[in-house]
Amino acid sequence: MSSSQSGVCPCQGSASHPTILYTLLSPGPRTRPMAPASRSHCLCQQHRPVRLCAPHRTCREALDVLGKTVAFLRNLPSFCLLPHEDQRRLLEGCWGPLFLLGLAQDTVTFEVAEAPVPSILKKILLEEPNSGAQGAQPPDPPQPSLAAVQWLQHCLESFWSLELGPKEYAYLKGTILFNPDVPGLHASCHIAHLQQEAHWALCEVLEPWYPASQGRLARILLMASTLKNISCTLLVDLFFRPVIGDVDITELLEDMLLLR
């Protein structure tokens, strides 16, 4: 049975016959720490780290989407009239899906290529033998996996296939923004009412196509729910860190909205 059929990662070799290099360089099973699954350097194709082919262009487009998101929030009186602390919490909880909707609305496309990963042997040979904790080099910045980026692209393509109009995008953003389930809200009941209003407005936009609009509404809401499963860390690692470094997007949005 092949490794792919048995569920064993091909890059790790057979479970009973590890590679010679792996045997020589690996400590005993009791002392070897488990690598986090999200950051393991698995050589399987779907888990290989990738990076943008055109980071400066894509990052510029991503920042433009953030700017349009801020403009959308500024022009939304129902959001601006909320307590500042509630605005901050809503931003922290929903900036990722709002940003993804902005990418979809602006039809932002991008390509990725495999990121170079130094071999274990190269790392060992280049490491200073007497380097302590103070002289150790900082770890390489995290890179998104191919599988995660492909899922993100699939979600964007699904939204493009729906061919949403500006009003549909606006009201859908409202249903995502006004999330009463965000912890720590002071006006959660009012925010729940705002979310319901945005949902009704979205239904009214689709009403001329009734009864076919019922299926369209279900598809729109289903696709919107998938956006919440895309990690904000992935968005930062892919679109922003390669050019502008480590940045807290929530704080950046707060600065742009003059909430800080």
Swiss-Prot record:
Q: Which GO molecular function entries does the Swiss-Prot or TrEMBL record give?
A: nuclear retinoic acid receptor binding; nuclear retinoid X receptor binding; nuclear thyroid hormone receptor binding; peroxisome proliferator activated receptor binding; protein domain specific binding; protein homodimerization activity; protein-containing complex binding; transcription corepressor activity
| Family to which the UniProt record says this protein belongs | Belongs to the nuclear hormone receptor family. NR0 subfamily.
Organism encoding this protein: Rattus norvegicus (Rat)
**PTMs?**
Arginine methylation by PRMT5 enhances repression activity of metabolic genes in liver in response to bile acid signaling, by increasing interaction with cofactors.
Keywords from the UniProt entry: Biological rhythms, Cytoplasm, Methylation, Nucleus, Receptor, Repressor, Transcription, Transcription regulation
Name of the protein in question: Nuclear receptor subfamily 0 group B member 2
Q: Which residues carry this modification: Symmetric dimethylarginine?
A: R57
Summarize the protein's role: Transcriptional regulator that acts as a negative regulator of receptor-dependent signaling pathways. Specifically inhibits transactivation of the nuclear receptor with which it interacts. Inhibits transcriptional activity of NEUROD1 on E-box-containing promoter by interfering with the coactivation function of the p300/CBP-mediated transcription complex for NEUROD1. Essential component of the liver circadian clock which via its interaction with NR1D1 and RORG regulates NPAS2-mediated hepatic lipid metabolism. Regulates the circadian expression of cytochrome P450 (CYP) enzymes.
